[in-house]
């Protein structure tokens, strides 16, 4: 079978409520091909120091990915090492997925807390 182009769609959901008061994610939509790398960004609610990342594949419930608090990774879900992230001094966070696979097509969400 010849090479087949697989599209990988990544959707992000913005926080509800006024933009300045909620969690914000960017980009809101992302389409990549298999093998590429994707980066998602999350800005927490002002004053929040913890950021949580979740994945929701089509037809499945939310799956926990990563938890960062005050710049440290505090917990990690059962995902391959190609899923990584970091938290910056301003408490915003980044989720990176390397060597994308078709099964990575999902809704990715971030949340924040004190």
UniProtKB/Swiss-Prot annotation:
Domain annotation Ig-like: ranges: 22-114
Gene this chain is encoded by: TRBV5-8
GO process terms (BP): adaptive immune response; cell surface receptor signaling pathway
InterPro entries according to UniProt: Ig-like_dom, Ig-like_dom_sf, Ig-like_fold, Ig_V-set, TCR_beta_variable
GO cellular component: plasma membrane; T cell receptor complex
Function field: V region of the variable domain of T cell receptor (TR) beta chain that participates in the antigen recognition. Alpha-beta T cell receptors are antigen specific receptors which are essential to the immune response and are present on the cell surface of T lymphocytes. Recognize peptide-major histocompatibility (MH) (pMH) complexes that are displayed by antigen presenting cells (APC), a prerequisite for efficient T cell adaptive immunity against pathogens.
Cited PROSITE patterns: IG_LIKE
Name of the protein described by the UniProt record: T cell receptor beta variable 5-8
């Amino acid at each position: 079978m010849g090479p087949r182009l697989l599209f990988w769609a990544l959707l992000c959901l913005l926080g509800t409520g006024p933009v300045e008061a909620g969690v914000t994610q960017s980009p809101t939509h992302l389409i990549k091909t298999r093998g590429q790398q994707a980066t998602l960004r999350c800005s927490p609610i002002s004053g929040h120091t913890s950021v949580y990342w979740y994945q929701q594949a089509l037809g499945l419930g939310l799956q926990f990915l990563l938890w960062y608090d005050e710049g440290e990774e505090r917990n990690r879900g059962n995902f391959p090492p190609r899923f990584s992230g970091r938290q910056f001094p301003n408490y915003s966070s980044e989720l990176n997925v390397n060597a994308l696979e078709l099964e990575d097509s999902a809704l990715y969400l971030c949340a924040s807390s004190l």
